[in-house]
Amino acid sequence: MAKDDVIEVDGKVIEALPNATFRVELDNKHVILCHIAGRMRMHYIKILPGDRVKIELTPYSLDKGRITFRYK
């Protein structure tokens, strides 16, 4: 999939689930499931409930996403 096809949104982590999966509430109050991107996993970036994150969504499935950035 091309990089142009992704939708980037911001949200807040509300719950940590098993297997590096998180429940994230978007700024528009929708709640989706997200997993951590591979580079974040490689660099051991920890994500905790309450963190602000940037999420990439595909146009094919808007209820699952990938966490690509954790704001400070």
From Swiss-Prot:
Record GO terms (molecular function): ribosome binding; rRNA binding; translation initiation factor activity
A Pfam family the protein falls into: eIF-1a
This protein's record includes keyword tRNA-binding: no
Compartments (UniProt record): Cytoplasm
Keywords attached to this entry: Cytoplasm, Initiation factor, Protein biosynthesis, RNA-binding, rRNA-binding
Annotated S1-like domain residues: 1-72
CDD domains found in the cross-reference section: S1_IF1 (cd04451)
PROSITE patterns (alphabetical): S1_IF1_TYPE
Main subcellular location: cytoplasm
Domain of life: Bacteria
InterPro entries the UniProt entry points to: NA-bd_OB-fold, RNA-binding_domain_S1_IF1, S1_domain, TIF_IF1
Cellular component, GO, one term: cytosol
Assembly notes: Component of the 30S ribosomal translation pre-initiation complex which assembles on the 30S ribosome in the order IF-2 and IF-3, IF-1 and N-formylmethionyl-tRNA(fMet); mRNA recruitment can occur at any time during PIC assembly.
NCBIfam families named in the record: infA
Function: One of the essential components for the initiation of protein synthesis. Stabilizes the binding of IF-2 and IF-3 on the 30S subunit to which N-formylmethionyl-tRNA(fMet) subsequently binds. Helps modulate mRNA selection, yielding the 30S pre-initiation complex (PIC). Upon addition of the 50S ribosomal subunit IF-1, IF-2 and IF-3 are released leaving the mature 70S translation initiation complex.
Assigned protein family: Belongs to the IF-1 family.
Protein name according to UniProt: Translation initiation factor IF-1
